[in-house]
């Protein structure tokens, strides 16, 4: 998995590429823990367009980030759109 972070005055965009699974889930959580304090005055976007797979742990990590931030999820492929809907719907049912 590759994580790219782009920061601007009002936003932080986290771009994820590859598999959000296995040993990469703790890395996503670590990066999130570092960036979360900076969100007080910024909005978060998570670009999942190039995510090819997310296991249960990866989906859970993304759900937790979404639950804390209501981040804008960027998805333009059927898989990414499915993943985005799954993340948002599960949060809304909770």
Model-derived features: where do they sit?
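Short beta-strand/loop segment at the start of cytosolic alpha/beta domains
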Residues: 1-15
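Amphipathic alpha-helical interaction surfaces in cytosolic regulatory modules
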Residues: 16-93
């Amino acid at each position: 998995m590759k994580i790219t972070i782009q920061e601007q005055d009002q936003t932080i965009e986290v771009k994820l590429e590859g598999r959000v699974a296995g040993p990469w889930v703790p890395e996503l959580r670590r990066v999130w823990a570092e960036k979360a304090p900076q969100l007080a005055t910024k909005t978060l976007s998570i670009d999942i367009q190039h995510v090819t797979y997310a296991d249960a742990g990866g989906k859970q990590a993304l759900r937790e980030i979404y639950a804390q931030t209501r981040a804008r999820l960027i998805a333009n492929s059927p898989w990414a759109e499915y993943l985005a809907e799954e993340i948002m719907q599960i949060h809304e049912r909770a």
